[in-house]
Amino acid sequence: MEPITQAFAQQFSREWIDAWNAHDLDRVLSHYADAFEMSSPMIVQIAGEPSGRLCGKDQVGAYWLKALRMIPALHFEWIATLAGIDSVAIHYRGANGRLALEVFHFGPGRRVVKAFAHYAE
């Protein structure tokens, strides 16, 4: 796989933020491999999963749907996008204005295979 370019990273982040702001889970999930793994402190709080990890579009999609129902005015404000060799990091302001950074690792077909969410207090 070719290294990720800044152009790809910017396009991915725009599409990802736009899909979330539209509350369109199908569009959000279209960026992910079927068996991707998500790690987030919010999984503990919202999904009740003590490990903070969920696997697969079904589990993560159900968690995200629950989050959207809990926070119906959810809106992300993009701050920055950073490109790595096989990863993209998006820095944004999320729910309740909280700073967030998500790191996405890409696999075949430029689909996310692992995602890691980080939040400020």
Regions found by a protein language model. Name each.
Residues 27, 33-79:
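A solvent-exposed, acidic/Ser-Thr-rich amphipathic alpha-helical stretch
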Residues 9, 13, 25, 57-64, ...:
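A structural signal for well-ordered alpha-helical scaffolds and beta->alpha junctions
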Residues 1-30, 34:
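Short, low-complexity N-terminal intrinsically disordered segments enriched in polar/charged residues
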